[in-house]
Structure formats: structure tokens, C-alpha cells
């Protein structure tokens, strides 16, 4: 409701009108209990908390007595002669306030009259002034004694004592390991690694496990990619990508996570973007006519405020907010930083005729020159957001991490950082430690996950239903959509063969390490001049080699000008018909210990001579962690005649010529090094393409993966009917499990042993006697594929599998 004192000259009430006023109540009114709630609800949107429409403010007694543009509004001791009473009483139907919303009742008017007649008394500390901004300035709290011990636990010890929270027990090594694996890299712990961890007697083993997992840069980046994609609205397909109204930042984001870019630099490059991070502030250029609050520059203002400052400007982008103190002018001032010309403020689709100024929402953190060019303004904004004086930046991200790991933020909602924390000192500690340690997010993650607070037994959300929240331990959490799909792939070994088709990894700038490098293969053909010209037709290639054992992964990447068909040991492998699109796939199931033969028929299409070539690299990874590369080079055998049986392993190619090397991947005319980065082919050489690199499906949508046209900082944790249907009757999961069962059933492992291994891998523990009996029953079917499928369904539907305890 709004109370706006009119600007026109007012007339005094007549004696007859005064007689119609509701009488003042006959008791001494309480300002805090009766007057404050009434005026807070009806008047402060326009006349309090920094706002003074019509020049009138009731923030303090002095301002109330001063009146507004039309003169005094209150006469102490004379409520009938007070203009404020005239307005709220409604005795003059042409001059009544509030203009919008519910009018004052006679009893409420009587309260206001009595308050004025009784001297306009207030209470110390109770007023309508704008509250001090919380969580903005940096602050390092003093840790309570005794010295030593984990800083988080030292701060929480008195909190737990005050709230009678029992912290005597922490979770077992098995539960801790499963929790940490899923939280750090999003994957289930391998059985061998888990058992080694449980058997380890080192007192520091939990800290060492956290640190080791955070150091797995590729797995870490792939896991956290989904988290940041949600927040930054980055995706691989959807509105705006086709017509250029939106741009991916996948490569920049992946590289930032892989290289653990300091968070302040990460934010700086998003606010003041590089070539590869500009998609964030570019936003989405919506088709057709859109509300002014959805223009790209306003999107940038909304998202910078929400994501990095925990401030909701969405309402204020259209009108002065009714849910917080932010105004239309605040939103436009920030949006103007990204505008090409001065912005006229538009209120609820109606132009106001007022030109916005240019400033950050907290100008005290850094000034922005409104006369400067756009690039300078954006740089000044980035400097303000990442200023050492901006404690809100670090508080907002550590609060998000705490919520991610423990199920609920120190401040809730996590996008409303102007709210009070349930433990201000803990929030300040995490934020100041992040800033003092180079804005290293992995430092904060380790700090949280090595605390006793993180290691407490999980608590069901229903147990946290107190009127006032009390932290008793981490909440039980559901696996994310990506974690669930990756967990099924971990059980079956049946990973995706490629990432999303339109994914782009330009700008990743990955440091060259073995887990992201690719084999240094050469383009080859039957003649040395093929890079310039080769006759139309096919060339037939063979490569024989030995493997020390059956590989765990065999990542193959191929391009051929123009087409190719590849076989492994005379079994179908892969094919391609466009040399510009590198093809890659994990073909581990085609290879064996001992001698293997790869054959490729590559065809130079067309009627005229043109460049021709084959480029191929294979990286094998074995159970002991060792690797072996096989590349296209001059050791390959080549022939230009299609001889019967040429692609069979036993064929004798001793009389064939050796291939001619044409140059490395980036040799002209192909120059595919950039394409390798853009489409993410280099990431294939880690064994798997995870769900975070895929487009969403009906399954992942049901499990909570959002439409990334809007910022999503937290996914729903409550199970839905749609999720239940997708998990029990959905085509996508049924196909994943069916394909996975087929892959497992083709192996040599006995069904009973396979069932127990899958159970152990899925839950992090061996089956009980009753569970073992159930698994034996499922494994006893005559059809191996169907039996394995039943086992996978049984395990995947267990709450213990789907939840993080």
C-alpha cells in the first residue's frame, strides 16, 4: 500500500468533516506494537527507508513534524487538525490515502489520532529509517579460545552449546568418502580407492582425500561446470544461440575452473568481459517486443547484482521494489554502465522522461564516471565489484558454497544477502579467509569439508522445521541430475561418446597436461603431395600393434578428407563424412590384450583432384593408470586397391607401402587445432564425456536441470511427481540402463560377482546378508542381459543410491 501526500495546495477540514472523523482510541497507544506495523505496511514504500515522495518522510519524528511539499502534516495534540489524519480517514473522497491498496479502517484511524493527541511518542531504536546495509564491509571475526583446532568448529562450539546440539559423532569413513567424492568431483568413489581410504590409519586421511580430489582438475571442472552454467545462464543450445542473440562462455568457464582461476579475477572477467566471456553480460536478445526490464543491459544489471552481490533487482527493473529498498533509479543506474547511450527510465512500460544516472548499486565501493566511454565505465564497474572493500562479493560466494555442501545457506535465501546470517561470525570468517588466500575457491571448499560441522551425520529436512533455524548438521541432499546420470554411467562403464553437438570450447586456455592433451598424430595419405592435390578415390590403411592388457578406455579421435570408415579387429568402430568435424569415441570394448589391428578406409570424394588426408589418434588407459598412444604416422601401411579381406586382422599387409606423412594436425589446408578446442575433442582423452557436457534430456529436466534462460542459483531439493515418473517409467533412463546392461552382460564377469560389485560401487559398502540374497536372486536369470538390467534397476532406485547422506 502506498501513502503519497499530494503536491497541490490543501484545504482544511470543515467542522462538519471533523465531526465525521473516527474517534481516537481511549487507551495509551504503543508505537512499537500498534503504530509502527500500521505505517510500515502502508506508508514506508514512499515515505520511509530513504524515500520521500512529495518531500514527506516519516523516518524520524523530526522529519514527520517537518512535513512535506504542501506544508506540515501533523499538529501534535490536535489530530483533528492534522493533514495526515485527513488523508487516511477518507472523509474527503477526493483526497484519500493510500491511493493504492487497502484503506485505513476506522479503528486504525483512531490509533493514529490517539498517537498524535498523546504527543507523537516513539520508542528508542524503532523508526522507519533505511536499515544499515548488512554483509557489505569486510570483517575478520575474533576466534574464541582455546587456540588450535579447526576455525569453523571453534566458532560453532558456543553456537552448538547454546542450542543444545549434540556433535559427539561424525559420519563413518565410507559415508564421508562418498559425500566428498560427490561434492568435489561429482562421481562415485571407485571401490578400490574407497577400501584403501577406509583401511588407511593416517589421522589426516580425510583432509588428504579432500585435497587430492580437489586437485583432480578435469573431474573438478566437469562437475562444477553444471553449477556455474546454472548461475551464469550458459548452455549449449536454446533461445538465442541460432540467431546470434546469445553467446556461449563454455570454453572460458571450463578453463577457469580447470585452472582454478582466482574468484576475484573470475568475476572481473565476467563483468569486464574478454572475447570468450562476453556471453554473460551480452545476455539474451529476445525476439520481438520485450519489456524494458528484459533488455540486455538490464539483464546485465540484474545478474551482476544477484550473482555476485546477492541483491534482487528484478522488481526494481520495472518499478520501485515492494520487497526491498531498491528503486527503479538504482536498477537503471547500473544498467546504464552497459548502455551505448543514456537510458530513459521506463516504469511499468511507461517512459518517465527521466534520464538515468550511472553508478554501482553501492557507490561507496567505487565511482563510475558517467561521462566516460562504455569500455571505461565497464572497467570501473568491474573494479568496484572486485574491490577489496567489497566484503559482499566473498560473502555471497562462500554462502553459496556452504549451501551447496550443507544443504542450506548461512544466509537464506542465498540471493538475499542483505538478510542476517544465522552465524555472522562464521560467514565473516569464510569470506575473509577466502579473500586472504588469493580468492582460491578450493581453499574455501577444503576449509568447509574438513570441518567437523561438514562431517556431522546428515539431518532430514523435516527435522529442520523449527520456527527459528538451528544448524544441526548437513541436510540430506538429492544427487543432482548430472550426478545421477554420471553415477549410472560409472556403474555400467557406458559413457557418452561425445559432448553436446554445439558445445564450444574456444577460450579454454587449458594448461597442457596429459589429461587434456591429445596424441600428436600426423595427417597421412598414400602420396606425399596429398595435402595439395590427390586423385579422387579411396586409400586403405592398416595398423597392427600390441597392448599389454585390455584397456580401461580407448579414446579415438579421427578426421579424414573427405570420409572414413574405421574398424577395430574387424568390428564396427566409427565413421565420418566431414573432415571439419573431428569424430571421437571410446572404443575400449573393441580392443583386447595382445595384438590388435585398426583399419581405415578413407575416401577423397569428388570428380577432380583435391587435398586428401587421414588424421587419427588413440589414447589407451589401463587399470594401473598407465597410458599408451597410437597415432597416424609413417608406420601405417597403405594401399589404393580394395582387396578382398584387407580389413581382417589376419590379412598379410607385408607388401603394402608405408604411408606418407603430410604434417601435424594444424597443417594446411585443414588447420584443425582450433576446431579441436572449439568442439572439445581434446577432452575425450580422459575416458568419458560427462552429463555436464550434454544437452538436457527429459530425464535431467525432470531431475532438476533448469532452463538456463534464467539465473538459477539453487535447484529444488524436494522430490516431485515428474521425477518419480522419469525414474520409474521414463524412456531416457530405461534406455541408459538397457544399454549399460548390454555392455556389462558382454563381459566375462560372473553375474553374482558383478551384482555385488555394482552394489558396492553404488552405495560405498558391501551388501548385507539379506541384500546379498536379493542380488543372487536377480543374478540367477537365464538371460544375462535381462538379469543385469534388473540388478541395475534395483540398485538405481534405492534412496541410499540417489541421496547424499
What kind of region is each of these model predictions?
Residues 12, 20, 63-88, 99-109, ...:
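Electron-transfer interface patches adjacent to heme c in soluble/periplasmic c-type cytochromes
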Residues 25-48, 145-183, 545, 554-560:
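Mature N-terminal segment immediately following signal peptide/propeptide cleavage
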Residues 26, 45, 51-56, 70, ...:
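Axial heme c-ligation environment in periplasmic c-type cytochrome domains
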Residues 29-31, 97-124, 375-378, 447:
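C-terminal capping alpha-helices of c-type cytochrome domains
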Residues 37-48, 56-59, 82-89, 110-117, ...:
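C-type cytochrome heme c attachment motif
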Residues 58, 95, 113, 124-365, ...:
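Short, structured secondary-structure elements
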Residues 509-531, 597-682:
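An acidic-aromatic loop/edge-strand motif
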Residues 545-568, 598-600, 656:
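Aromatic-lined ligand-binding clefts that engage carbohydrates, nucleic acids, or primary amines
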Amino acid at each position: 500500500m502506498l501513502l503519497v501526500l499530494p503536491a497541490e495546495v490543501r484545504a482544511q477540514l470543515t467542522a462538519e468533516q471533523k465531526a465525521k472523523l473516527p474517534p481516537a482510541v481511549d487507551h495509551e497507544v504503543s508505537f512499537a506494537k500498534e503504530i509502527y506495523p500500521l505505517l510500515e505496511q502502508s506508508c514506508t514504500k514512499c515515505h520511509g527507508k530513504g524515500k520521500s515522495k512529495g518531500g514527506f518522510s516519516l523516518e524520524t519524528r523530526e522529519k514527520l513534524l517537518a512535513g512535506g511539499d504542501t506544508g506540515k502534516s501533523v499538529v501534535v495534540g490536535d489530530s483533528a487538525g492534522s493533514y495526515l489524519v485527513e488523508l487516511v480517514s477518507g472523509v474527503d473522497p477526493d483526497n484519500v490515502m493510500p491511493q493504492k491498496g487497502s484503506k485505513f479502517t476506522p479503528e486504525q484511524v483512531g490509533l493514529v489520532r490517539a498517537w498524535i493527541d498523546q504527543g507523537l511518542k516513539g520508542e528508542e531504536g524503532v523508526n522507519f529509517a533505511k536499515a544499515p546495509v548488512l554483509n557489505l564491509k569486510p570483517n575478520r571475526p575474533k576466534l574464541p579460545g582455546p587456540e588450535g583446532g579447526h576455525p569453523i568448529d571453534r566458532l560453532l562450539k558456543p553456537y552448538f552449546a547454546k542450542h543444545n546440539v549434540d556433535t559427539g559423532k561424525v559420519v563413518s569413513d565410507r559415508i564421508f568418502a562418498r559425500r566428498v567424492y560427490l561434492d568435489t568431483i561429482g562421481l562415485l568413489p571407485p571401490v578400490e580407492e574407497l577400501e584403501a581410504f577406509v583401511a588407511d590409519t593416517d589421522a589426516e586421511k580425510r583432509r588428504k582425500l579432500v585435497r587430492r580430489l580437489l586437485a583432480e582438475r578435469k573431474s573438478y571442472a566437469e562437475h562444477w561446470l553444471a553449477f556455474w552454467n546454472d548461475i551464469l545462464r550458459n548452455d549449449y543450445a536454446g533461445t538465442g544461440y541460432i540467431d546470434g542473440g546469445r553467446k556461449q562462455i563454455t570454453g572460458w568457464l571450463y578453463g577457469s575452473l580447470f585452472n582454478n582461476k582466482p574468484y576475484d579475477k573470475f568475476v572481473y572477467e565476467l563483468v569486464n568481459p574478454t572475447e570468450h566471456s562476453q556471453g554473460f553480460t551480452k545476455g539474451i536478445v529476445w525476439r520481438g517486443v520485450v519489456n524494458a526490464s528484459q533488455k540486455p543491459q538490464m539483464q546485465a544489471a540484474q545478474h551482476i547484482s544477484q550473482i555476485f552481490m546477492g541483491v534482487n533487482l528484478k522488481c526494481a527493473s520495472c518499478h520501485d521494489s515492494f520487497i526491498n529498498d531498491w528503486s527503479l533509479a538504482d536498477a537503471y543506474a547500473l544498467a546504464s554502465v552497459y548502455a551505448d547511450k543514456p537510458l530513459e527510465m521506463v516504469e511499468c512500460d511507461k517512459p518517465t522522461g527521466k534520464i538515468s544516472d550511472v553508478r554501482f548499486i553501492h557507490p561507496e565501493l567505487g565511482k563510475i564516471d558517467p561521462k566516460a566511454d562504455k569500455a571505461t565505465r565497464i572497467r570501473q564497474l568491474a573494479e568496484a565489484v572486485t574491490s577489496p572493500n567489497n566484503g559482499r562479493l566473498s560473502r555471497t560466494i562462500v554462502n553459496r558454497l556452504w549451501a551447496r555442501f550443507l544443504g542450506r545457506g548461512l544466509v537464506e535465501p542465498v540471493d538475499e544477502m542483505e538478510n542476517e546470517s544465522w552465524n555472522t561470525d562464521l560467514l565473516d570468517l569464510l569470506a575473509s579467509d577466502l579473500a586472504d588466500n588469493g580468492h582460491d575457491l578450493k581453499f574455501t571448499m577444503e576449509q568447509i569439508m574438513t570441518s567437523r560441522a561438514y562431517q556431522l551425520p546428515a539431518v532430514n529436512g523435516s527435522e529442520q522445521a523449527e520456527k527459528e533455524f538451528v544448524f544441526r548438521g548437513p541436510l540430506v541432499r538429492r544427487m543432482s541430475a548430472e550426478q545421477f546420470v554420471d553415477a549410472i554411467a560409472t556403474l555400467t562403464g557406458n559413457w557418452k561418446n561425445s559432448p553436446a553437438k554445439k558445445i564450444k570450447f574456444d577460450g579454454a586456455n587449458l594448461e597442457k597436461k596429459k589429461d587434456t592433451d591429445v596424441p600428436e598424430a600426423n595427417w597421412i595419405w598414400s602420396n606425399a603431395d596429398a595435402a595439395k592435390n590427390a586423385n579422387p578415390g579411396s586409400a586403405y590403411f592398416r595398423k597392427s600393434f600390441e597392448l599389454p592388457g585390455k584397456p580401461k578406455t580407448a579414446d579415438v579421435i579421427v578426421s579424414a578428407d573427405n570420409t572414413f570408415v574405421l574398424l577395430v579387429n574387424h568390428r564396427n568402430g566409427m565413421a565420418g563424412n566431414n573432415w571439419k568435424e573431428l569424430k571421437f569415441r571410446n572404443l575400449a570394448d573393441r580392443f583386447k590384450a595382445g595384438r590388435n589391428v585398426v583399419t581405415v578406409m578413407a575416401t577423397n570424394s569428388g570428380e577432380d583432384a583435391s587435398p586428401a588426408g587421414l588424421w587419427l589418434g588413440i589414447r589407451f588407459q589401463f587399470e594401473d593408470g598407465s597410458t599408451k598412444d597410437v597415432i597416424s604416422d609413417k608406420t601405417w601401411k597403405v594401399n589404393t586397391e580394395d582387396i578382398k579381406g584387407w580389413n581382417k586382422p589376419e590379412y598379410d599387409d607385408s607388401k603394402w607401402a608405408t604411408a606418407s606423412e603430410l604434417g601435424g594436425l594444424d597443417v594446411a589446408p585443414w588447420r584443425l587445432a582450433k576446431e579441436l578446442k572449439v568442439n572439445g575433442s581434446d577432452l575425450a582423452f580422459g575416458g568419458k564425456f560427462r552429463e555436464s557436457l550434454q544437452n538436457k534430456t527429459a530425464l535431467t529436466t525432470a531431475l532438476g536441470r533448469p532452463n538456463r534462460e534464467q539465473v538459477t542459483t539453487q535447484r529444488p531439493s524436494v522430490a516431485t511427481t515428474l521425477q518419480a515418473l522419469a525414474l520409474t517409467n521414463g524412456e531416457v533412463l530405461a534406455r541408459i540402463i538397457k544399454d549399460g546392461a548390454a555392455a556389462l552382460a558382454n563381459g566375462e564377469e560372473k553375474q553374482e560377482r558383478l551384482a555385488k560389485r555394482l552394489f558396492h560401487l553404488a552405495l560405498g559398502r558391501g551388501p548385507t546378508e539379506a541384500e546379498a540374497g536379493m542380488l543372487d536372486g536377480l543374478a540367477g536369470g537365464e538371460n544375462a542381459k535381462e538379469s543385469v538390467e534388473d540388478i541395475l534397476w534395483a540398485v538405481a532406485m534405492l534412496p541410499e543410491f540417489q541421496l547424499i547422506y
